[in-house]
């Protein structure tokens, strides 16, 4: 049976269509995925992301442990609350998962990892903690609500109380802050400004209701996926996995090769890949022909060979079909995509497609 978040009853009250996602019963939409998408781009929407896995990493060895575990380097983090996006890698250089790390002190970090990979991630993290003075604590006592959109911050601030409201109001992008049992990060997965708010599970339903009264529209997994695709943000299990390097997933920027003396899981494999060259490119596609781009469709790249779409769909903001794809190194700006057996013209672009409500590519 699927697990339920603390907001499960709220979703049922709102008439959500519920689906299984990574073992959790989650809302796909509340009536109109397109309307929910536009609400986030134009005003404010909220997502129940309580299924995400929150892990507190504490101890005198926390910093050294994370510098070994993650491809990005937590030593960059100097200001309390600052967040870092990174991948955990296999020794062969594949992606175990992507995650966000919040730096609270040299002995205290908070990690937010994906829901569908919870058990695998926790086991991986614990196995690699051997020899480090570190304690890993899963925070399954917390719920999490993401409020996103151009008016999302203001509407969230209007219903936050006391100290956490002051903390949240002062946050810069990609920084988090804590007050009591509440934690707010100015982060998200939509390409819009907003907050991701962690709070005691028992307090989540009332907070959800207050946000709704303030004019924040509930949004489901369907809108979350089209928003993150427009924002050019990777989805684990589609755009990268244990068989694919971050260097071929548009994530080279998340790998810290400096300082050279830092060893991290997967480093040697990535250095070999870099030295060998010929890495596939991770690109955006805009369909210029008919149909809708979908994952696993073949990308016909002429003399360069073939690539594959990793994520695709219709962009409600742009009114065209877009995709993320992995293509051979020598691919030109024009390609064709095999859409149901018919080659359709498409154009290579550099993601993102949309950020902060504005188109980033020519249509």
UniProtKB/Swiss-Prot annotation:
Gene Ontology annotations for the cellular component aspect, listed alphabetically: cytosol; glycine cleavage complex
Catalytic activity: N(6)-[(R)-S(8)-aminomethyldihydrolipoyl]-L-lysyl-[protein] + (6S)-5,6,7,8-tetrahydrofolate = N(6)-[(R)-dihydrolipoyl]-L-lysyl-[protein] + (6R)-5,10-methylene-5,6,7,8-tetrahydrofolate + NH4(+)
Cited Gene3D superfamilies: Aminomethyltransferase beta-barrel domains, Aminomethyltransferase fragment, Probable tRNA modification gtpase trme, domain 1
GO BP terms, alphabetized: glycine decarboxylation via glycine cleavage system
Keyword Repressor: no
SUPFAM superfamilies xref list: Aminomethyltransferase beta-barrel domain, Folate-binding domain
GO molecular function, one term: aminomethyltransferase activity
Domain of life: Bacteria
Disulphide bonds in the chain: none
Entry keyword annotation includes Chaperone: no
Signal peptide (from-to): none
Complex and partners: The glycine cleavage system is composed of four proteins: P, T, L and H.
Protein family according to the UniProt entry: Belongs to the GcvT family.
Role: The glycine cleavage system catalyzes the degradation of glycine.
Protein name, per record: Aminomethyltransferase
Organism: Thioalkalivibrio sulfidiphilus (strain HL-EbGR7)
